[in-house]
């Protein structure tokens, strides 16, 4: 891809500006520290960047995808990520790998087969939504209320957390049209240190970080080594590593709850294009700054490692 290309970037990053500049600045900083050039593909530039990329005028050795719509193949960011993968750019994460992992209906049976604890689930295809009826067996399996999620949904859009009947499927489908919907038993986390035992675990090219994530208030706090030991939270790492091995994903987070019975249940399987809003910018829903910085560093290191191997 290098012959005839006017401009080559070591690392490009797609971004929809749905976070603050802290993560972007840390990526830029770490690139500068290890002598990688960098380009931020913002909405204002994406059409032109795509055109130049398509015509072979620019190329990126690595592309960090922080924004593309899996459910909208016509989306310009989606098309750019696919084009980059076709042009042998190292994409974090490759679009086919990311889509397969992000598709909850597709991943759910694989997790079950791998003996990873997930909520009891019924999968309903879009074509069945209008005429679907819960059997008595279904009602026992799901309990009441139960949760409904679109297979390719994110950001809670289309999620119904207080479903009581099949009629609630229409609410989810109206909010987020999708090919499939998951009806799931609602998992209630136990309480530890006056907070829900609910965690967001980040996997970034073999490195793992753990956050307490309050599923009722959205607040994050990094788990300490002492807490990991005191509360027996070591299974969190094993679970996220198994999910990484199963999916082939290199950068994602998983939401995991611990129940009163002590079981660790994976609630939200794979979140790619992780939310990197910093806590200093938004204390209510932001990720701790030191964690955002550490993830940015590991991503840049991984890009450099791949570039070195490719040369």
Segments and roles (model prediction):
Residues 146, 209-210, 252, 265-268:
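Protein kinase-like catalytic core scaffold
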Residues 249-261:
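A short glycine-rich, hydrophobically flanked beta-strand micro-motif that places a catalytic Asp/Glu
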Residues 258-311:
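C-terminal active-site "lid" helix and adjoining low-complexity regulatory extension at the edge
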Residues 16-130:
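Conserved N-proximal alpha/beta basic substrate-recognition cap immediately N-terminal to
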Residues 111-112, 138-157, 178-193:
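ATP-grasp fold ATP-binding core
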Residues 97-98, 125-129, 151-155, 165-167, ...:
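Short acidic/polar capping segments at secondary-structure boundaries
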Residues 1-13:
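Extreme N-terminal starter segment of soluble prokaryotic enzymes
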Residues 160-247:
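Phosphate-binding site of ATP-dependent enzymes
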